[in-house]
């Protein structure tokens, strides 16, 4: 299967190529292991790794619609490699239709963020909460479409059960190895101008995996997770 998928990236006039791949040749197999990922997420939580400063998203987004949470479910593949579960959202959805995303959604009133991420993963891909051990979280971000503060949680699944997509929300469930994500022909950075901000620019992170293109908020989350491992 060829790299890239049906997703359309709405590049603005004036965009340009960004920095080269920051991970290829630098991240080892050990650094891509579950144990190293868990250790680095713990360092982020305790402040040994500085949290990202500045706005939740570039360009800045005014958060007006509460909170959301997503789950990056990691598991070991048949060769011992670390893999992550992704979904292609249904083309029938009103927002981010057809885009690649982690399972997740809005947080209900009085609901804890990680509980919402687990609940949504169960609803969208049939991954029951008892199969997941939360090992950390990334900084929240937001999108101009959702206008919700999205908190990404990282979980480890010891034995991945059969997954079933919710017909209403998910068109495809797939997984990809972290090793593939750092390959030069998979990843690229693009620099986009910020509308109505003279000289303003922001980075867009794109991953061309087999059959799909990951970008936007999910691309930014994957970029952050991989960058933590250096």
Regions found by a protein language model. Name each.
Residues 165-208:
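NUDIX/MutT-family hydrolases
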Residues 1-101, 105-123, 127-161, 179, ...:
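N-terminal leader/linker segments that precede catalytic domains of diphosphate-processing enzymes
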């Amino acid at each position: 299967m060829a790299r890239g998928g049906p997703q359309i990236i709405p590049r603005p006039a004036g965009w340009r190529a960004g920095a080269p791949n920051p991970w290829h040749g630098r991240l080892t197999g050990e650094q891509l292991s579950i144990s190293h990922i868990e250790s680095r997420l713990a360092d982020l939580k305790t402040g040994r790794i500085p949290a990202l400063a500045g706005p939740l998203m570039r360009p800045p987004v005014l958060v007006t619609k509460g909170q959301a949470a997503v789950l990056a479910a990691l598991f070991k593949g048949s060769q011992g490699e670390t893999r992550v579960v992704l979904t292609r959202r249904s083309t029938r959805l009103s927002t981010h239709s057809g885009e690649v995303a982690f399972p997740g959604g809005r947080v209900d009133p009085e609901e804890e963020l990680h509980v919402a991420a687990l609940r949504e993963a169960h609803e969208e891909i049939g991954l029951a909460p008892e199969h997941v051990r939360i090992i950390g979280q990334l900084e929240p971000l937001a999108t101009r479409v959702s206008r919700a503060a999205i908190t990404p949680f990282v979980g480890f699944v010891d034995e991945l059960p059969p997954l079933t997509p919710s017909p209403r929300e998910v068109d495809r469930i797939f997984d990809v190895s972290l090793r593939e994500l750092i390959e030069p022909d998979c990843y690229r950075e693009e620099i986009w101008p910020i509308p109505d901000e003279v000289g303003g620019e922001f980075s867009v992170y794109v991953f061309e995996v087999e059959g799909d293109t990951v970008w936007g908020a999910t691309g930014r989350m994957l970029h952050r997770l991989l960058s933590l491992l250096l």
